[in-house]
């Protein structure tokens, strides 16, 4: 846990799907003693609720209502929605696609950003998503834009799906098409599009191991945030 007697620190990790944000952010948070915040999981939780309620993702008013009413709690490696553990339920292609669609709705984004800021203003965090360094915490102490080439991102995401469902419910070709569409939607949406913050460090993880990426980011944190802390 972060030491509340010291200045809280925000490490923002942005990037497209499949770049390795979640894996890296979890490991980094553990090493730093910070709280890990998966903002994408928050959007997924709202998308799951919408699917269960039969609410069309295009119904902006209803989606905004759901986002504002959703009781989302994040724990170590878990997420609950209205008191129910939905950690596994949100990790399906259908929910992932829905999350990307509702992520372009301004009212939904406002509700999620408010929840994310409230967490980050309480304690030190490693927060990953698509607009953390540009919108949620533009004054983050450390900003990383984590990327990988499209083929590698598809391969990683497909392997992730296969570990949960074998045979997977989607082919690798279908996943590639969905991810390409999502990349386009995320980078061209009018409200908080996926973009590298001007002061973010760009890191291509295509040919790097998890340990190598973690160490590279940890080195950046050490150089920018001393604050009497020992980031070993």
From Swiss-Prot:
CDD domains membership: CMPK
Cellular compartments per GO CC? cytosol
- InterPro entries associated with the record: Cytidylate_kin, Cytidylate_kinase_dom, P-loop_NTPase
Single biological process term from Gene Ontology? pyrimidine nucleotide metabolic process
Indicate where this protein resides in the cell. Answer: Cytoplasm
The EC number of this protein is 2.7.4.25
Top EC class, one word: transferase
Q: Which keywords, in A-to-Z order, does the entry hold?
A: ATP-binding, Cytoplasm, Kinase, Nucleotide-binding, Transferase
Q: Is Transferase among this UniProt entry's keywords? A: yes
- Residues that coordinate or bind ATP: 15-23
Q: What is the originating organism of this protein? A: Solibacter usitatus (strain Ellin6076)
SUPFAM superfamilies membership = P-loop containing nucleoside triphosphate hydrolases
Reaction(s) catalysed (UniProt annotation): CMP + ATP = CDP + ADP; dCMP + ATP = dCDP + ADP
Instruction: Give the main location.
Output: cytoplasm
Any one GO molecular-function label of the UniProt entry? ATP binding
Q: Which family does it belong to?
A: Belongs to the cytidylate kinase family. Type 1 subfamily.
| Span list, region Disordered | 164-192
Q: What is this protein called?
A: Cytidylate kinase
Comp. bias intervals (Basic and acidic residues): 178-189
| Gene3D superfamilies associated with the record | P-loop containing nucleotide triphosphate hydrolases
